A protein has these predicted regions:
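Catalytic Walker B motif of ABC-type/P-loop ATPase nucleotide-binding domains
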Residues: 165-168
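A short, proline-enriched helix->beta-strand linker immediately N-terminal to the Walker B motif
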Residues: 159-163
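Conserved ABC ATPase signature
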Residues: 140-144, 148
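The feature captures the beta-strand-to-loop junction immediately N-terminal to the Walker
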Residues: 46-48
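Conserved ABC transporter NBD signature motif
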Residues: 69-81
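Conserved structural motif at the start of ABC-family nucleotide-binding domains
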Residues: 15-17, 30
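Conserved ABC ATPase "signature" region
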Residues: 107, 111, 118-136, 188
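Helix-to-loop junction immediately C-terminal to a conserved catalytic motif
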Residues: 61
Length: 263
């Protein structure tokens, strides 16, 4: 069962979108996005295809810049990518370096931080144990299952000691049991580290299970249309939490939102 962590107030946002719009090649992608994310908060983003979920994540990461408005981190405009913001993608096949071992992929993040070589091995062992990959150091990504490759991505992200985890549908390609196991691992890691999470997903149940809040976007152009607070107690459980009346109510509310958006 995931560890307990405090409910977070959003009085002083760690990340803020202020009237953010984005157009590319004359095509309007986002319009007037206003959104805040508090330190230690777990925010999930849902919406139909084409609503800009991944684009908002890339703006936080500093991989894109808005056409107008501002995205701020710790009160300052986001510029280039930062070491304390880690990104985890769904396509683990492209995210991992196939010519590096499991340990080598985790080491990459430490190398970029300038961690002395003598200090890396112990930290790598610690991180691999934390994500359930103890003893897998010398294997290569193509020797791992999809779930194990995603665990490796998590370990590599944690090697950056990130304050923020940006997760772009990381479990969408996995089977149901593996997906739920990784959901619980992420919740446990977040509880232990206090990291802030911005999590993009198409899975409404996943959004309710993981999040403190769920933000719903509408498409063409992408814009914020709904924000739902998730007041389910933590730690959450894959069986009992999902069977509560509040979980079912929130899932239905989000389902109706998506259904109406796609009508």
């Amino acid at each position: 069962m995931p560890a307990v962590r405090p409910v977070v107030a959003v009085a002083e946002p760690l990340i803020a979108f202020r009237d953010v719009s984005l157009s590319i090649g004359g095509h309007e992608i986002l319009r007037n996005i206003n959104m805040t994310i508090g330190k230690g908060e777990f925010v999930c983003v849902v919406g139909p295809s084409g609503c800009g979920k991944t684009t908002t994540l890339r703006l936080i990461a500093g991989l894109m810049k808005p056409s107008s408005g501002t995205v701020t981190y710790q009160g300052k405009p986001v510029g280039a990518p930062r070491q304390d913001i880690a990104i985890m993608f769904q396509d683990y096949g492209r995210a991992l370096l196939p010519w590096r071992t499991v340990a080598g992929n985790v080491s990459l993040a430490m190398e970029s931080l300038g961690t002395p070589k003598a200090e890396r091995a112990g930290r790598i062992d610690e991180l691999l144990a934390k994500v359930g990959l103890r003893g897998q150091n010398d294997r290569y990504p193509n020797q791992l299952s999809g779930g194990m490759q995603q665990r490796l991505q998590i370990a590599r992200c944690l090697a950056q000691n990130p304050a923020v985890l940006l997760m772009d549908e990381p479990f969408g390609a996995l089977d149901a049991m593996t997906r739920q196991a990784l959901q619980d691992e992420v919740l446990a890691i977040v509880a232990a580290t206090g990291a802030t999470v911005f999590f993009v997903t198409h899975d409404l149940e996943e959004a309710v299970y993981l999040g403190d809040r769920v933000v719903g976007l509408l498409p063409h152009p992408g814009r914020v249309a709904k924000t739902v607070s998730v007041n389910l107690p933590r730690p959450r459980d894959q069986l009992t939490s999902r069977e509560t009346p509040e979980f079912l109510r929130l899932r239905r509310e989000l389902f109706d939102f998506i259904k109406e958006a796609e009508a």
